[in-house]
Amino acid sequence: MKRQSDPKKGALTGPSQRQLRAGELIRHALVEILREEELQDEALQNISVTVSEVRMSPDLKHAICFVEPLGAGLTGQDTTDIIKGLNRVSKFLRGRLGRSIDMKFTPDLKFIHDESFGTAAYMDKLFLDPRVQQDTRRLSDVVDDEDEA
């Protein structure tokens, strides 16, 4: 997560508690809206989408929504089309969101593909590699020897 600088300390700080709480509120509301609404965009017909995270701007007027389309056989182009479709209907979703949450301002929505699922799958694949498993076995043997001593 991108960190913001704290002008008082000169150090990096994370999002505020308010931003985190608003992001979770919007994420839950978006999940319900996407589950219940029949979106008219062609790229979004019969598609399930997971909203994994919503990051809010400090003024809570902009939200970046990280999404992962679900479904077997989706290609990179399909995913790109789905993200573009979500961005096309973002004004509609914002209107529905405004009716379902209690915030002073309903944030503008921007949808981005969440790469963390692909990264996790790649890491799992790496850990299953025989060379890596050999190294982890050696490491566990060293740790066991230290525990016995």
Curated annotation (Swiss-Prot):
Gene symbol of the encoding locus: rbfA
Family the entry assigns: Belongs to the RbfA family.
Subunit structure: Monomer. Binds 30S ribosomal subunits, but not 50S ribosomal subunits or 70S ribosomes.
Annotated GO biological process: maturation of SSU-rRNA
Keyword Cytoplasm: yes
Keyword entries, A-Z: Cytoplasm, Ribosome biogenesis
Identification of the protein by name: Ribosome-binding factor A
The protein's role, per its UniProt record: One of several proteins that assist in the late maturation steps of the functional core of the 30S ribosomal subunit. Associates with free 30S ribosomal subunits (but not with 30S subunits that are part of 70S ribosomes or polysomes). Required for efficient processing of 16S rRNA. May interact with the 5'-terminal helix region of 16S rRNA.
Cytoplasm found in the keyword field: yes
A Pfam match: RBFA
Subcellular location, record wording: Cytoplasm
UniProt main location, coarse: cytoplasm
HAMAP family on file: RbfA
Any one GO cellular component localisation term in the record: cytosol
NCBIfam families hit by this protein: PRK00521.2-5, rbfA
